[in-house]
Design a protein with these regions (language model features):
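Extracellular glycan-modifying ectodomains
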Residues: 1-378
Length: 378
């Protein structure tokens, strides 16, 4: 008996063009989506095929008439600004009718799920908090102004589409009440007897997500709700461990809570969605960071938002998907850096020469981008 005969006949097959051998086949469930290879991530349809699967809508639903409220972490501000510049109706813009609301002025600083929940509880449920919790980025204390509460309520009730971005699970809270601050505690008011740093747990964040969903559905039952997770890492941790490992834990807690919440709730709520901005940035692009290793390269951000626009928004996007993809790949080392500048300046022959020794997939990608950009010119 030859070695391996007891395991059954040797099966030979290919996966993504690579030869494979096995003595057994395995039942992999009703849904089986393989992790992409690096080659899989070269093509312009990489994000559509390997990241958005299971999360994309059947058809674009955001039109210029859709009322949008977007807040949470700093990544929510990118979404708000992008959509507003393209004449979509973002209600909580600083220069808009509800520009005095905290979700307009400081929405990018509400990065933990407690801070997001507080805005819904305060504005829609009239909840009062025992402590003053809200400091802006300049450490100025913001009070529970009734006029601002009513403006926030009006904006939230007018919204057709909520985009809520979570950023971190590390929080500062009041020891006596357990209530959580927007941000860290300003140095001049910090009191170790009153203020406590901690990492909010998976169960806490899951509970907060459920409460946010419950309140929205109570007051605005037909609105669409989208959650996202910001890829922007912690600037620092207050834990006695490295910031890199603390950030990994912080994002994992939030992503796990989101996944459990969405898995349980989406089957019963067709208007509940997730946009995988975190996965696009972290898994698709390699050299994604600016030199400070916190800010995402603008070309990558623009690609994430261009993809969002192609998937979610009606009308013709400002930038073609192949164009945005090539631009981001040039900025992150996936293509020669000069390729996009050649395309942008109309030096199409130079762009083709720059990738002449690259793979067929990359040459085809540059050709697609060239055709898109030529169509915009004429």
């Amino acid at each position: 008996m030859k070695i391996g005969d007891e395991a059954g006949p040797l099966l030979k097959f290919q996966v993504d063009g690579l030869n494979q051998e096995a003595h057994k086949t395995w039942f992999r469930g009703v849904h089986c989506n393989f992790n992409p290879t690096l080659k899989n991530l070269h093509n312009v349809d990489a994000v559509s095929n390997h990241v958005l699967k299971g999360w994309a809508p059947k058809a674009p639903t955001i039109s210029p008439q859709t009322n949008i409220v977007a807040f949470g972490s700093c990544f929510a501000e990118h979404i708000s600004q992008w959509l507003a510049k393209r004449d979509f109706n973002v209600l909580n813009q600083k220069d808009g009718a509800w520009g005095d609301t905290y979700i307009a002025r400081f929405g990018e600083g509400m990065a933990n799920s407690y801070a997001v929940l507080q805005q819904f509880e305060w504005a829609l449920e009239g909840k009062a908090f025992a402590e003053t919790l809200w400091h802006d980025k300049d450490a100025t204390l913001q009070d529970y102004n009734e006029e601002i509460r009513l403006q926030t309520k009006a904006a939230l009730l007018a919204s057709d589409f909520y985009i809520i971005t979570l950023g971190l699970s590390e929080v500062w809270s009041h020891r006596a009440t357990g209530e959580v601050f927007w941000r860290a505690v300003p140095q001049d008011v910090y009191d170790p007897a009153l203020h406590e740093f901690r990492v909010s747990t998976h169960s806490e964040n899951l509970s907060n997500l459920k409460q946010i969903h419950r309140i929205i559905r109570k007051h605005n039952p037909d609105a669409k709700i989208m959650f996202t997770l910001s890829p922007v890492p912690l600037v620092a941790t207050f834990r006695p461990v490295s910031c890199i490992t603390a950030n990994s834990a912080s994002k994992a807690i939030l992503r796990a809570a989101l996944d459990e919440f969405l898995s349980a709730t989406r089957p019963e709520d067709e208007n509940l969605h997730y946009w995988p901005s975190y996965e696009i940035v972290m898994d698709v692009f390699q050299n994604r960071w600016s030199d400070d290793r916190r800010h995402i390269k603008p070309q990558v951000l623009d690609y994430v938002m261009t993809a969002f626009e192609h998937v979610w928004c009606t009308g013709k996007p400002q930038m073609g998907l192949s164009q945005a993809w090539v631009r981001a790949r040039c900025a992150t080392g996936g293509l020669p850096p000069k390729v996009y500048s050649f395309l942008e300046s109309g030096q199409f022959e130079n762009a083709e020469k720059a990738v002449s020794n690259w793979s067929v997939e990359n040459r085809n990608l540059v050709e697609q981008a060239k055709l898109e950009m030529m169509s915009q010119r004429f």
